Amino acid sequence: MSTSGTGKMTRAQRRAAARRNRWTARVQPVIVEPLAAGQGKAIKAIAGYSISKWEASSDAITAKATNAMSITLPHELSSEKNKELKVGRVLLWLGLLPSVAGRIKACVAEKQAQAEAAFQVALAVADSSKEVVAAMYTDAFRGATLGDLLNLQIYLYASEAVPAKAVVVHLEVEHVRPTFDDFFTPVYR
């Protein structure tokens, strides 16, 4: 005698699960700047959240050394009220110019006295030699605020010397939608 809820899936459920896995299996090994049309896969923000995107070009990176880049908030989010907004998911991805050779790694970690130690404590690493050029932090920053992101740095490592502005670091942060003031200040006569 069979019992209900034994975990058996219907044919439609099995096909849907297989389709989901097929979508997530596509990974871009290296994202070449400028972005080609249709490259990557868009992920929607959770209801009530919005996504802020900003990018920074790296300075010249010396070979076999770890360099640090600070995170600066976009101008519209730098007010004290917006620094209190809760953060959801964070996406870090590397854009490499076609002229870049060798291995490039990037990670987000708290500010370190020794930059070399950042990759040991990093939450995830974006690596151009492996197929993880984008690092998605789904739960690591949940509950943090946008102001807390200012205590973070992006660390870059290159196996060969890289000129300035050859690596573009893109950071996308999902956060609670800011409440902008939609009304003009009342004018009293």
Curated annotation (Swiss-Prot):
Which Gene3D superfamilies is this protein grouped with?
Satellite virus coat domain
- Indicate, by first and last residue, each region the UniProt record lists as having compositional bias (Basic residues): 11-21
Task: Look up keyword ATP-binding and say if it applies.
Answer: no
* Signal peptide (from-to): none
Quote the cellular component terms of the Gene Ontology held in the record.
host cell endoplasmic reticulum; ribonucleoprotein complex; T=3 icosahedral viral capsid; viral nucleocapsid
Q: Which InterPro entries match?
A: Bromo_CP
Q: Where in the cell is it found?
A: Virion
Q: Which Pfam families does UniProt cross-reference here?
A: Bromo_coat
Region annotation (Disordered) maps to: 1-21
Q: Tell me, what is one Gene Ontology molecular-function annotation carried by this entry? A: structural molecule activity
| Alphabetical UniProt keywords | Capsid protein, Ribonucleoprotein, RNA-binding, T=3 icosahedral capsid protein, Viral nucleoprotein, Virion
What is said about the domains?
Answer: The N-terminal arginine-rich region binds selectively to subgenomic RNA4.
Query: What function does the entry list?
Result: Capsid protein. Binds specifically to the subgenomic RNA4 to ensure selective packaging.
Q: What protein am I looking at?
A: Capsid protein
The species this protein was found in = Brome mosaic virus
